[in-house]
């Protein structure tokens, strides 16, 4: 029995020494571990148990502070990028986000072969684009209940209708609210030249804000009637949220916007759930 007790003493003391060295990543702490081991063993068994529990807690990985396994390249204003950002927040997954300058063609081209965002660099180091493909990949990667893939025709029809004029409200404003992709004059000039060709002169669109806002306010009740709850547009969290929230979020940069209560509650709740902030405080 004495031999067995002696062996246990030696094993325990050595274990304490090794654990101290591992935790502190310092060989000099092995001496401290030896001293602690001797003290605990000579004291009471309960102290030994408590110390072992504390050691286990210290060496277990902290799931709340996990390193991002993926990297997402975006523009802050881009609704397709918002789709990709949403799924990480909704699934509670960490992701490193990097914002390209709007006139940076080399960065995205080096990753995916063309100037496009969002771009996701996956855990294996390969890159992928297409916002909904990214959403599906991350949704599967999370290993939780999948998003509802139902998109009601009424939702799609509303998005198509409002999408015909909503960019005339948001495109001229996103270069005015201090977004990182427009930090340089060259990035702003690049965007203005490209988008003015698609949506018309920015100054003219700003001048017609009241007209476009009136049209939007007339269309919003139709969407409000389709919202099931504050937490999701459909019966449960799904792709209707992924394709609708980005447009509603971007419209919050328009000063004078008045959302019906159902939409306002939904937008604010989804911003918190997804971790994608709104633009109310920047509205112009």
Pin down the residues of each PLM region.
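Juxtamembrane interface helix immediately N-terminal to a transmembrane segment
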Residues: 1-14
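Aromatic-anchored segments of alpha-helical transmembrane domains
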Residues: 15-21
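Short, mixed-charge aromatic SLiMs
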Residues: 38-41, 161-162, 265-281
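Membrane-helix interfacial anchor on the cytosolic side
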Residues: 47-64
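GST-like domain detector, emphasizing the conserved glutathione-binding G-site
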Residues: 67-190
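Non-transmembrane alpha-helical segments in soluble domains
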Residues: 135, 139, 156-159, 217-220, ...
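GST-like fold's C-terminal all-alpha helical module
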Residues: 164-268
């Amino acid at each position: 029995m004495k031999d067995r007790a002696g062996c246990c003493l030696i094993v325990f003391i050595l274990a304490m020494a090794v654990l101290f060295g591992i935790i502190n990543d310092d060989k000099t702490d092995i001496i401290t571990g030896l001293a602690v081991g001797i003290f605990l063993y000579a004291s009471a068994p309960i102290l030994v148990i408590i110390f072992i529990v504390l050691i286990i807690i210290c060496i277990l990985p902290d799931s709340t502070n996990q390193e991002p396994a993926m990297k997402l390249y975006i523009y802050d204003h881009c609704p397709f990028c918002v789709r990709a950002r949403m799924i990480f927040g909704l699934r509670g997954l960490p992701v490193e986000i990097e914002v390209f300058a709007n006139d940076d063609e080399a960065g995205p081209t080096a990753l995916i072969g063309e100037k496009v965002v969002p771009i996701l660099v996956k855990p294996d180091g390969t890159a992928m684009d297409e916002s909904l493909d990214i959403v599906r990949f991350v949704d599967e990667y999370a290993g939780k209940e999948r998003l509802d893939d139902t998109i009601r025709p009424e939702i799609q029809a509303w998005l198509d209708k409002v999408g015909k004029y909503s960019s005339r409200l948001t495109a001229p404003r996103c270069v005015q609210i201090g977004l990182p992709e427009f930090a340089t004059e060259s990035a702003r000039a690049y965007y203005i030249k490209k988008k003015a060709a698609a949506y018309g002169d920015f100054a003219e669109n700003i001048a017609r804000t009241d007209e476009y806002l009136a049209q939007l306010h007339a269309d919003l009740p139709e969407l409000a009637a389709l919202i099931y709850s504050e937490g999701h547009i459909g019966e449960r969290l799904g792709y209707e949220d992924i394709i609708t929230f980005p447009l509603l979020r971007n419209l919050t940069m328009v000063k004078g916007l008045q959302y019906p209560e159902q939409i306002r509650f939904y937008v604010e709740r989804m911003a918190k759930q997804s971790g994608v902030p709104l633009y109310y405080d920047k509205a112009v």
